[in-house]
Protein backbone atom coordinates (compact mmCIF):
# COMPACT_ATOMS: atom_id res chain seq x y z
CA UNK A 1 0.00 0.00 0.00
CA UNK A 2 1.28 3.50 -0.76
CA UNK A 3 2.07 6.12 1.85
CA UNK A 4 -1.06 8.10 0.97
CA UNK A 5 -3.57 5.49 2.13
CA UNK A 6 -1.53 4.73 5.25
CA UNK A 7 -1.47 8.39 6.20
CA UNK A 8 -5.12 8.66 5.46
CA UNK A 9 -6.04 5.78 7.75
CA UNK A 10 -4.59 7.78 10.66
CA UNK A 11 -6.36 10.90 9.43
CA UNK A 12 -9.65 9.03 9.04
CA UNK A 13 -9.49 7.65 12.56
CA UNK A 14 -9.77 11.22 13.85
CA UNK A 15 -12.06 12.70 11.25
CA UNK A 16 -14.46 10.04 10.05
CA UNK A 17 -18.06 11.11 10.31
CA UNK A 18 -21.21 12.23 8.51
CA UNK A 19 -24.30 14.32 8.45
CA UNK A 20 -26.93 13.62 11.02
CA UNK A 21 -29.51 13.79 8.25
CA UNK A 22 -28.88 10.10 7.73
CA UNK A 23 -27.64 9.30 11.16
CA UNK A 24 -28.88 5.79 11.59
CA UNK A 25 -29.75 3.38 8.79
CA UNK A 26 -31.59 0.84 10.89
CA UNK A 27 -33.87 2.71 13.27
CA UNK A 28 -36.48 2.78 10.52
CA UNK A 29 -40.14 3.36 11.21
CA UNK A 30 -39.98 1.73 14.63
CA UNK A 31 -39.75 5.05 16.48
CA UNK A 32 -42.67 6.37 14.46
CA UNK A 33 -44.81 3.80 16.26
CA UNK A 34 -43.12 3.45 19.63
CA UNK A 35 -42.64 6.68 21.56
CA UNK A 36 -39.15 6.03 22.84
CA UNK A 37 -36.97 9.11 23.36
CA UNK A 38 -33.75 8.85 21.36
CA UNK A 39 -30.74 11.10 21.01
CA UNK A 40 -31.02 13.55 18.11
CA UNK A 41 -27.77 13.24 16.19
CA UNK A 42 -27.86 16.87 15.09
CA UNK A 43 -28.49 18.73 18.31
CA UNK A 44 -27.84 16.04 20.89
CA UNK A 45 -31.23 16.75 22.40
CA UNK A 46 -33.52 13.95 23.47
CA UNK A 47 -36.43 13.96 21.03
CA UNK A 48 -39.06 11.73 19.45
CA UNK A 49 -36.95 11.28 16.33
CA UNK A 50 -38.61 9.59 13.36
CA UNK A 51 -36.32 7.84 10.91
CA UNK A 52 -37.23 7.12 7.32
CA UNK A 53 -39.04 3.81 6.88
CA UNK A 54 -38.24 3.63 3.18
CA UNK A 55 -34.52 4.14 2.96
CA UNK A 56 -33.70 3.15 6.51
CA UNK A 57 -31.92 6.46 6.96
CA UNK A 58 -33.16 9.54 8.75
CA UNK A 59 -34.86 11.78 6.21
CA UNK A 60 -33.04 15.12 5.76
CA UNK A 61 -35.04 17.89 7.32
CA UNK A 62 -33.77 20.86 5.34
CA UNK A 63 -34.75 24.24 6.63
CA UNK A 64 -35.09 23.07 10.25
CA UNK A 65 -32.80 25.05 12.47
CA UNK A 66 -30.34 23.14 14.60
CA UNK A 67 -29.60 26.18 16.70
CA UNK A 68 -32.07 25.30 19.45
CA UNK A 69 -32.57 22.12 21.39
CA UNK A 70 -36.29 21.81 21.68
CA UNK A 71 -38.53 18.84 22.09
CA UNK A 72 -41.12 18.06 19.44
CA UNK A 73 -43.93 15.52 19.22
CA UNK A 74 -45.43 13.52 16.38
CA UNK A 75 -47.81 16.23 15.21
CA UNK A 76 -44.88 18.70 15.08
CA UNK A 77 -42.42 16.39 13.33
CA UNK A 78 -42.36 17.10 9.56
CA UNK A 79 -41.27 13.51 8.91
CA UNK A 80 -44.15 11.88 10.77
CA UNK A 81 -47.06 10.41 8.84
CA UNK A 82 -50.27 8.70 9.95
CA UNK A 83 -50.89 6.17 7.19
CA UNK A 84 -49.21 7.05 3.89
CA UNK A 85 -46.41 9.19 2.48
CA UNK A 86 -44.83 9.63 -0.94
CA UNK A 87 -41.44 11.19 -1.58
CA UNK A 88 -38.22 10.86 -3.47
CA UNK A 89 -34.79 12.17 -4.37
CA UNK A 90 -32.95 13.04 -7.55
CA UNK A 91 -29.71 14.37 -8.99
CA UNK A 92 -28.54 16.09 -12.19
CA UNK A 93 -24.82 16.59 -12.94
CA UNK A 94 -22.79 18.35 -15.64
CA UNK A 95 -19.04 17.60 -15.80
CA UNK A 96 -16.18 19.19 -17.76
CA UNK A 97 -13.23 16.79 -18.13
CA UNK A 98 -9.66 16.90 -19.45
CA UNK A 99 -9.23 13.15 -20.02
CA UNK A 100 -10.49 10.45 -22.38
CA UNK A 101 -13.08 7.77 -21.84
CA UNK A 102 -10.70 4.86 -21.18
CA UNK A 103 -7.37 4.99 -19.36
CA UNK A 104 -6.58 1.43 -20.46
CA UNK A 105 -6.34 2.29 -24.16
CA UNK A 106 -4.54 5.62 -23.96
CA UNK A 107 -1.03 4.26 -24.43
CA UNK A 108 1.84 4.05 -21.96
CA UNK A 109 0.81 7.31 -20.28
CA UNK A 110 -2.70 6.16 -19.40
CA UNK A 111 -5.74 8.22 -20.29
CA UNK A 112 -5.14 10.52 -23.28
CA UNK A 113 -5.33 14.28 -22.81
CA UNK A 114 -8.56 15.51 -24.35
CA UNK A 115 -11.45 17.79 -23.47
CA UNK A 116 -14.97 16.44 -23.22
CA UNK A 117 -18.12 17.39 -21.38
CA UNK A 118 -20.98 15.25 -20.08
CA UNK A 119 -24.41 15.89 -18.61
CA UNK A 120 -26.61 13.29 -16.95
CA UNK A 121 -29.36 12.44 -14.50
CA UNK A 122 -27.56 9.82 -12.38
CA UNK A 123 -30.73 8.83 -10.56
CA UNK A 124 -34.27 9.79 -9.67
CA UNK A 125 -36.08 7.79 -7.03
CA UNK A 126 -39.67 7.59 -5.83
CA UNK A 127 -40.36 6.22 -2.36
CA UNK A 128 -43.47 5.43 -0.36
CA UNK A 129 -44.51 4.11 3.03
CA UNK A 130 -47.93 2.69 3.88
CA UNK A 131 -49.11 1.59 7.33
CA UNK A 132 -51.48 -1.37 7.28
CA UNK A 133 -51.61 -0.95 11.05
CA UNK A 134 -49.41 0.56 13.72
CA UNK A 135 -47.15 -2.52 13.62
CA UNK A 136 -47.17 -3.47 9.92
CA UNK A 137 -45.52 -1.12 7.40
CA UNK A 138 -45.03 -1.50 3.66
CA UNK A 139 -42.10 0.42 2.15
CA UNK A 140 -41.04 0.67 -1.47
CA UNK A 141 -38.59 2.61 -3.61
CA UNK A 142 -38.24 2.67 -7.38
CA UNK A 143 -35.10 4.22 -8.87
CA UNK A 144 -34.54 5.47 -12.41
CA UNK A 145 -30.86 5.63 -13.34
CA UNK A 146 -29.44 7.60 -16.28
CA UNK A 147 -32.92 8.44 -17.49
CA UNK A 148 -33.67 5.15 -19.21
CA UNK A 149 -35.00 1.63 -19.10
CA UNK A 150 -32.73 -1.27 -18.26
CA UNK A 151 -32.62 -4.67 -19.88
CA UNK A 152 -34.01 -8.07 -19.03
CA UNK A 153 -31.70 -10.99 -19.72
CA UNK A 154 -32.96 -14.57 -19.96
CA UNK A 155 -30.90 -17.74 -20.05
CA UNK A 156 -32.54 -19.90 -22.72
CA UNK A 157 -31.78 -23.46 -21.65
CA UNK A 158 -33.65 -24.73 -24.72
CA UNK A 159 -31.21 -22.87 -26.97
CA UNK A 160 -27.90 -24.36 -25.79
CA UNK A 161 -27.85 -22.10 -22.75
CA UNK A 162 -27.48 -18.88 -24.75
CA UNK A 163 -28.28 -15.44 -23.32
CA UNK A 164 -31.23 -13.55 -24.76
CA UNK A 165 -31.74 -9.82 -24.25
CA UNK A 166 -35.37 -8.72 -24.31
CA UNK A 167 -35.19 -4.93 -23.94
CA UNK A 168 -32.18 -2.64 -24.14
CA UNK A 169 -31.57 1.03 -23.37
CA UNK A 170 -28.81 3.04 -21.74
CA UNK A 171 -30.30 3.45 -18.28
CA UNK A 172 -32.06 1.33 -15.70
CA UNK A 173 -35.30 1.15 -13.79
CA UNK A 174 -35.03 -0.91 -10.62
CA UNK A 175 -37.09 -1.78 -7.57
CA UNK A 176 -34.52 -0.68 -5.04
CA UNK A 177 -36.66 -1.50 -2.03
CA UNK A 178 -39.89 -3.41 -1.47
CA UNK A 179 -40.36 -4.82 2.00
CA UNK A 180 -42.79 -5.28 4.85
CA UNK A 181 -41.72 -4.46 8.40
CA UNK A 182 -43.22 -5.95 11.56
CA UNK A 183 -42.62 -3.66 14.53
CA UNK A 184 -42.39 -5.62 17.77
CA UNK A 185 -40.29 -3.78 20.37
CA UNK A 186 -37.60 -1.10 20.21
CA UNK A 187 -35.00 -3.84 20.64
CA UNK A 188 -36.24 -6.37 18.09
CA UNK A 189 -38.16 -6.06 14.82
CA UNK A 190 -38.43 -8.06 11.60
CA UNK A 191 -38.39 -7.15 7.92
CA UNK A 192 -38.86 -9.28 4.80
CA UNK A 193 -38.50 -8.33 1.15
CA UNK A 194 -36.11 -6.36 -1.01
CA UNK A 195 -33.91 -4.06 1.06
CA UNK A 196 -30.67 -2.09 1.26
CA UNK A 197 -27.56 -4.04 2.29
CA UNK A 198 -25.98 -1.56 4.76
CA UNK A 199 -22.32 -2.40 4.08
CA UNK A 200 -20.09 0.66 3.89
CA UNK A 201 -21.10 4.26 4.41
CA UNK A 202 -22.62 5.14 1.03
CA UNK A 203 -25.06 2.23 0.82
CA UNK A 204 -26.46 3.02 4.24
CA UNK A 205 -26.68 6.75 3.42
CA UNK A 206 -27.07 7.02 -0.34
CA UNK A 207 -29.37 10.04 -0.72
CA UNK A 208 -27.69 13.13 -2.28
CA UNK A 209 -27.97 15.22 0.90
CA UNK A 210 -25.66 12.74 2.62
CA UNK A 211 -22.47 13.39 0.66
CA UNK A 212 -20.89 16.71 -0.35
CA UNK A 213 -19.72 15.87 -3.87
CA UNK A 214 -21.74 16.15 -7.05
CA UNK A 215 -21.50 12.35 -7.26
CA UNK A 216 -21.33 9.58 -4.67
CA UNK A 217 -17.91 8.75 -3.18
CA UNK A 218 -16.01 6.95 -5.91
CA UNK A 219 -14.05 4.39 -3.93
CA UNK A 220 -16.99 2.49 -2.45
CA UNK A 221 -18.96 2.40 -5.71
CA UNK A 222 -15.93 1.09 -7.59
CA UNK A 223 -15.67 -1.94 -5.28
CA UNK A 224 -19.20 -2.67 -4.00
CA UNK A 225 -22.66 -2.65 -5.54
CA UNK A 226 -24.06 0.86 -5.03
CA UNK A 227 -26.85 1.13 -4.19
CA UNK A 228 -26.67 -2.46 -2.93
CA UNK A 229 -30.13 -3.98 -2.53
CA UNK A 230 -31.06 -7.64 -2.23
CA UNK A 231 -34.04 -9.80 -1.27
CA UNK A 232 -34.12 -11.56 2.08
CA UNK A 233 -34.97 -11.34 5.77
CA UNK A 234 -33.66 -8.90 8.39
CA UNK A 235 -33.87 -8.24 12.11
CA UNK A 236 -33.07 -4.84 13.59
CA UNK A 237 -33.44 -2.76 16.71
CA UNK A 238 -31.85 -0.52 19.32
CA UNK A 239 -30.26 -1.71 22.55
CA UNK A 240 -28.69 0.01 25.53
CA UNK A 241 -29.23 3.50 26.86
CA UNK A 242 -27.50 6.85 27.23
CA UNK A 243 -23.85 6.65 26.17
CA UNK A 244 -24.08 2.88 25.67
CA UNK A 245 -26.75 2.99 22.94
CA UNK A 246 -26.36 0.78 19.88
CA UNK A 247 -28.37 0.16 16.74
CA UNK A 248 -28.00 -3.20 15.03
CA UNK A 249 -29.14 -4.94 11.88
CA UNK A 250 -28.59 -8.52 10.73
CA UNK A 251 -29.84 -10.02 7.49
CA UNK A 252 -29.71 -13.00 5.18
CA UNK A 253 -30.10 -12.11 1.50
CA UNK A 254 -29.34 -13.41 -1.98
CA UNK A 255 -25.56 -13.74 -2.29
CA UNK A 256 -23.28 -12.17 -4.89
CA UNK A 257 -22.63 -14.00 -8.16
CA UNK A 258 -18.99 -14.67 -9.08
CA UNK A 259 -19.87 -14.37 -12.77
CA UNK A 260 -19.98 -10.60 -12.37
CA UNK A 261 -16.59 -10.12 -10.70
CA UNK A 262 -13.96 -8.40 -12.84
CA UNK A 263 -10.70 -6.47 -12.92
CA UNK A 264 -12.00 -2.92 -12.80
CA UNK A 265 -14.81 -3.07 -10.23
CA UNK A 266 -13.92 -6.17 -8.17
CA UNK A 267 -17.28 -7.55 -6.90
CA UNK A 268 -19.44 -4.48 -7.63
CA UNK A 269 -20.98 -6.13 -10.69
CA UNK A 270 -21.68 -9.38 -8.85
CA UNK A 271 -25.04 -8.19 -7.59
CA UNK A 272 -27.83 -10.42 -8.86
CA UNK A 273 -30.90 -9.10 -10.64
CA UNK A 274 -30.13 -9.63 -14.32
CA UNK A 275 -32.49 -12.59 -14.38
CA UNK A 276 -36.11 -13.01 -13.40
CA UNK A 277 -35.06 -15.08 -10.37
CA UNK A 278 -32.01 -14.74 -8.11
CA UNK A 279 -29.96 -17.73 -7.00
CA UNK A 280 -30.21 -18.40 -3.28
CA UNK A 281 -27.92 -21.42 -3.30
CA UNK A 282 -25.32 -19.63 -1.19
CA UNK A 283 -26.94 -16.72 0.68
CA UNK A 284 -25.14 -13.60 1.75
CA UNK A 285 -25.04 -12.68 5.44
CA UNK A 286 -24.73 -9.04 6.47
CA UNK A 287 -24.50 -7.38 9.86
CA UNK A 288 -24.16 -3.79 10.96
CA UNK A 289 -23.64 -2.23 14.40
CA UNK A 290 -23.76 1.51 15.11
CA UNK A 291 -22.80 3.25 18.33
CA UNK A 292 -25.04 6.32 18.66
CA UNK A 293 -24.66 7.21 22.33
CA UNK A 294 -22.72 10.48 22.02
CA UNK A 295 -24.03 13.82 20.82
CA UNK A 296 -23.62 14.21 17.05
CA UNK A 297 -21.42 11.12 16.69
CA UNK A 298 -22.07 7.74 15.12
CA UNK A 299 -19.43 5.03 14.80
CA UNK A 300 -20.33 1.96 12.79
CA UNK A 301 -18.98 -1.33 11.53
CA UNK A 302 -20.45 -3.68 8.93
CA UNK A 303 -19.58 -7.15 7.68
CA UNK A 304 -20.67 -9.25 4.71
CA UNK A 305 -19.98 -12.93 4.07
CA UNK A 306 -20.99 -15.28 1.27
CA UNK A 307 -19.93 -18.91 1.73
CA UNK A 308 -19.55 -19.66 -1.99
CA UNK A 309 -20.04 -16.99 -4.65
CA UNK A 310 -19.47 -19.51 -7.43
CA UNK A 311 -22.57 -21.45 -6.30
CA UNK A 312 -24.70 -18.44 -7.25
CA UNK A 313 -23.53 -18.57 -10.86
CA UNK A 314 -26.25 -18.97 -13.48
CA UNK A 315 -23.86 -21.43 -15.16
CA UNK A 316 -22.13 -23.36 -12.34
CA UNK A 317 -20.23 -25.38 -14.94
CA UNK A 318 -17.99 -22.33 -15.43
CA UNK A 319 -16.28 -23.17 -12.17
CA UNK A 320 -16.22 -26.96 -12.38
CA UNK A 321 -14.57 -28.61 -9.38
CA UNK A 322 -12.69 -25.55 -8.14
CA UNK A 323 -14.29 -25.77 -4.68
CA UNK A 324 -15.81 -22.94 -2.68
CA UNK A 325 -15.12 -19.26 -3.45
CA UNK A 326 -16.04 -17.42 -0.22
CA UNK A 327 -16.18 -13.63 -0.06
CA UNK A 328 -15.69 -11.45 3.03
CA UNK A 329 -16.12 -7.67 3.20
CA UNK A 330 -15.38 -5.61 6.31
CA UNK A 331 -16.16 -1.92 6.64
CA UNK A 332 -15.72 0.69 9.34
CA UNK A 333 -17.24 4.15 9.17
CA UNK A 334 -18.01 7.05 11.45
CA UNK A 335 -20.01 10.24 11.30
CA UNK A 336 -19.90 13.50 13.20
CA UNK A 337 -21.87 16.72 12.84
CA UNK A 338 -22.62 19.88 14.75
CA UNK A 339 -23.65 23.43 13.83
CA UNK A 340 -20.22 24.26 12.45
CA UNK A 341 -18.65 21.18 10.92
CA UNK A 342 -19.70 17.98 9.20
CA UNK A 343 -17.25 15.17 8.51
CA UNK A 344 -17.60 11.61 7.34
CA UNK A 345 -15.37 8.73 6.39
CA UNK A 346 -15.23 5.03 5.61
CA UNK A 347 -12.72 2.21 5.13
CA UNK A 348 -13.63 -0.94 3.15
CA UNK A 349 -11.51 -4.09 2.91
CA UNK A 350 -12.47 -7.21 1.02
CA UNK A 351 -11.10 -10.72 0.51
CA UNK A 352 -12.12 -13.15 -2.25
CA UNK A 353 -10.83 -16.73 -2.11
CA UNK A 354 -10.03 -18.61 -5.34
CA UNK A 355 -9.77 -15.30 -7.21
CA UNK A 356 -7.06 -16.76 -9.46
CA UNK A 357 -9.30 -19.65 -10.52
CA UNK A 358 -12.27 -17.33 -11.05
CA UNK A 359 -10.09 -15.16 -13.29
CA UNK A 360 -9.05 -18.08 -15.45
CA UNK A 361 -12.63 -19.37 -15.79
CA UNK A 362 -14.09 -16.01 -16.86
CA UNK A 363 -12.68 -16.52 -20.31
CA UNK A 364 -15.53 -18.99 -20.83
CA UNK A 365 -18.16 -16.23 -20.92
CA UNK A 366 -19.82 -16.14 -24.32
CA UNK A 367 -19.95 -12.96 -26.39
CA UNK A 368 -23.66 -12.70 -25.60
CA UNK A 369 -23.02 -12.91 -21.86
CA UNK A 370 -23.92 -9.81 -19.80
CA UNK A 371 -20.74 -10.32 -17.78
CA UNK A 372 -17.28 -8.84 -18.23
CA UNK A 373 -14.34 -11.00 -19.31
CA UNK A 374 -11.80 -8.40 -18.17
CA UNK A 375 -9.45 -10.06 -15.67
CA UNK A 376 -7.71 -10.72 -13.34
CA UNK A 377 -10.10 -10.50 -10.42
CA UNK A 378 -8.19 -9.53 -7.26
CA UNK A 379 -7.94 -11.46 -4.01
CA UNK A 380 -8.04 -8.21 -2.00
CA UNK A 381 -9.58 -4.83 -2.72
CA UNK A 382 -9.52 -1.68 -0.63
CA UNK A 383 -11.11 1.74 -0.37
CA UNK A 384 -10.72 4.50 2.20
CA UNK A 385 -11.98 8.04 2.09
CA UNK A 386 -13.28 10.96 4.06
CA UNK A 387 -14.61 14.47 3.66
CA UNK A 388 -15.01 17.53 5.86
CA UNK A 389 -17.25 20.54 5.33
CA UNK A 390 -17.97 23.65 7.37
CA UNK A 391 -21.15 25.70 7.65
CA UNK A 392 -20.08 29.30 7.00
CA UNK A 393 -23.42 30.78 8.08
CA UNK A 394 -23.16 29.28 11.55
CA UNK A 395 -19.45 30.01 11.91
CA UNK A 396 -19.99 33.68 11.06
CA UNK A 397 -23.27 33.74 13.05
CA UNK A 398 -25.14 35.52 10.27
CA UNK A 399 -28.72 34.16 9.99
CA UNK A 400 -29.40 36.12 6.78
CA UNK A 401 -26.42 34.62 4.97
CA UNK A 402 -27.03 31.77 2.47
CA UNK A 403 -26.19 28.34 3.88
CA UNK A 404 -22.85 27.66 2.18
CA UNK A 405 -20.66 24.64 2.99
CA UNK A 406 -17.16 24.50 1.46
CA UNK A 407 -15.68 21.01 1.70
CA UNK A 408 -12.70 18.84 0.86
CA UNK A 409 -12.66 15.09 0.23
CA UNK A 410 -9.82 12.57 -0.09
CA UNK A 411 -10.16 9.01 -1.40
CA UNK A 412 -7.86 6.10 -2.11
CA UNK A 413 -9.10 2.93 -3.74
CA UNK A 414 -7.68 -0.06 -5.55
CA UNK A 415 -9.82 -2.94 -6.86
CA UNK A 416 -6.54 -4.86 -7.29
CA UNK A 417 -4.90 -4.26 -3.94
CA UNK A 418 -3.57 -7.84 -4.04
CA UNK A 419 -3.63 -10.20 -7.03
CA UNK A 420 -2.66 -13.87 -6.88
CA UNK A 421 0.07 -15.29 -9.15
CA UNK A 422 0.42 -15.88 -12.02
CA UNK A 423 -1.72 -12.78 -12.55
CA UNK A 424 -0.28 -9.28 -12.18
CA UNK A 425 -2.06 -6.21 -10.79
CA UNK A 426 -2.70 -3.33 -13.17
CA UNK A 427 -1.31 -0.13 -11.64
CA UNK A 428 -3.76 1.98 -13.64
CA UNK A 429 -6.46 0.92 -11.18
CA UNK A 430 -4.63 2.33 -8.16
CA UNK A 431 -6.28 5.71 -7.61
CA UNK A 432 -5.79 8.57 -5.17
CA UNK A 433 -8.06 11.58 -5.56
CA UNK A 434 -8.85 14.94 -4.03
CA UNK A 435 -12.14 16.77 -4.42
CA UNK A 436 -12.79 20.35 -3.31
CA UNK A 437 -16.06 22.18 -3.67
CA UNK A 438 -19.02 24.09 -2.33
CA UNK A 439 -22.59 23.17 -1.38
CA UNK A 440 -25.40 25.73 -1.29
CA UNK A 441 -28.39 24.51 0.69
CA UNK A 442 -31.28 26.39 -0.86
CA UNK A 443 -33.71 24.96 1.70
CA UNK A 444 -36.76 22.70 1.60
CA UNK A 445 -34.61 19.75 0.54
CA UNK A 446 -32.89 21.39 -2.47
CA UNK A 447 -29.11 21.70 -2.77
CA UNK A 448 -26.73 23.12 -5.41
CA UNK A 449 -23.23 21.64 -5.70
CA UNK A 450 -19.96 22.53 -7.43
CA UNK A 451 -16.63 20.70 -7.14
CA UNK A 452 -13.23 20.12 -8.72
CA UNK A 453 -11.63 16.65 -8.71
CA UNK A 454 -8.10 15.55 -9.50
CA UNK A 455 -7.05 11.89 -9.64
CA UNK A 456 -3.53 10.52 -9.33
CA UNK A 457 -3.30 7.22 -11.20
CA UNK A 458 -0.80 4.50 -10.30
CA UNK A 459 1.02 6.67 -7.79
CA UNK A 460 1.54 9.38 -10.41
CA UNK A 461 3.02 7.11 -13.10
CA UNK A 462 0.16 7.85 -15.50
CA UNK A 463 -1.68 10.95 -16.66
CA UNK A 464 -3.80 12.59 -13.99
CA UNK A 465 -7.55 12.93 -14.54
CA UNK A 466 -9.15 16.27 -13.69
CA UNK A 467 -12.71 17.54 -13.89
CA UNK A 468 -15.03 20.32 -12.77
CA UNK A 469 -18.67 19.48 -12.07
CA UNK A 470 -21.94 21.22 -11.27
CA UNK A 471 -24.94 19.51 -9.74
CA UNK A 472 -28.41 20.01 -8.34
CA UNK A 473 -30.21 17.56 -6.07
CA UNK A 474 -33.27 17.23 -3.87
CA UNK A 475 -34.65 14.97 -1.17
CA UNK A 476 -38.08 15.23 0.40
CA UNK A 477 -41.61 14.02 1.01
CA UNK A 478 -44.27 15.30 -1.41
CA UNK A 479 -47.43 13.90 0.14
CA UNK A 480 -48.36 12.67 3.61
CA UNK A 481 -51.60 11.72 5.29
List where the protein language model places each region.
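Active-site glycine- and acidic-residue-rich loops that bind
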Residues: 226, 276-283, 322-326
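N-terminal periplasmic/intermembrane-space "pro-region" immediately following the signal or transit peptide
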Residues: 20-105, 481
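Loop-centered beta-sheet repeat module
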Residues: 260, 266-312
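Bacterial N-terminal signal peptides
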Residues: 7-17
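Positively charged n-region of N-terminal signal peptides that target proteins for export
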Residues: 1-6, 241
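Outer membrane beta-barrel
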Residues: 77-97, 115-258, 281-286, 290-298, ...
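Solvent-exposed loop/turn segments connecting transmembrane beta-strands
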Residues: 118, 145-148, 225, 277-279, ...
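Outer-membrane beta-barrel pore domains
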Residues: 97-101, 113, 163-168, 178-181, ...
Amino acid sequence: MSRSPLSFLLFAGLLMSATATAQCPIKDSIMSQIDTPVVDGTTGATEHHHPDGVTGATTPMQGRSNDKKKKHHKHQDPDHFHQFRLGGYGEAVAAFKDYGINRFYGGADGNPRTHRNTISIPRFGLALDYKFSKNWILSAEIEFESGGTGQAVELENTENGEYETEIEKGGEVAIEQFHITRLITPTFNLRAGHMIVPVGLTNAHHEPMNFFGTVRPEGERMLLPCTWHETGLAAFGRVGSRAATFDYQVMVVAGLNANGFDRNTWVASGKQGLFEEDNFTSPGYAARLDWVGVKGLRVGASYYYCHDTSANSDKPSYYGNMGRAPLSILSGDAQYTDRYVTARGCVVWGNLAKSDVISSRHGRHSNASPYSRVTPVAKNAMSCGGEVGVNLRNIISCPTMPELLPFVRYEYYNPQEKVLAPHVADQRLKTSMWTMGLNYRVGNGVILKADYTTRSIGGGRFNSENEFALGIAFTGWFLKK
